[in-house]
Amino acid sequence: EVGALLADWLLRRGVRGTYAASLVSGSLMHALATAHGVRTAETPTGFKWIVRAGTDADPLVYGYEEALGYAVAPDVVRDKDGISAALAVALLAAELKASGRTLTDRLDELAREHGLFATGQLSVRVEDLALIADAMARLRAAPPAALLGRPVEPADLAEADPPVDAVRLLGDRVRVIVRPSGTDPKLKAYLETVVP
C-alpha cells in the first residue's frame, strides 16, 4: 500500500510524467494515475527496468515494486531510494495529521474512491528446480479459463518485450501472475482482486 500512497501523494501534488511499477506490484497505482490522466508503465521486476520506463515526452517521475523499493525522485537517484521514500512518507503523514487523518484513513478513502485492491502472494519452495520448470510448462500449455468463477485471459509473458518468465491471468477485477523466483528455489503466485 505504501507504493500506492506515495503515487497518490505525488499525483495530488500535480507531479506529471510516467508512473511505473513492476508487473507483480498491485495495480492501484495504475488506477490512480489513470484517473489523473497520467501515463503508467508496467515493467519486469527489478529497478533496472523501472527506471527505464519513462519516455522523452513523459519522463519517469515515480516507480515502485512490491518488494519494497521506491523511486520518488528518479531524476535525482535512478534506483530505489529508501531515504527519499522515507522522507516522502513522513511528509505525507504530516500533511494527513494536520487534517486529522492517518495513512490508514487515506487508504480507506482510496478504497472508497477506486475500489479495494486486495493483494497477496503464495510461494511454493522446492528442492528440485525441474519442478518449477515443469509447473510453468503445464500452466502455459493449459491455463485456467476462469478464476473465482470469473473468466480470465491468459498471457504468456515470455512472448512479451522484454520477455519475462511468467504467466498472467487477467479478468474482471481479478489478476494472478505466476513466475519462478529470481533469487530462491520457489514458484510464486501474485494474487489481486478488486472489490468495487
Residue map of PLM features:
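Phosphate-binding and adjacent anionic-ligand microenvironments
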Residues: 5, 13-182, 186-190, 196
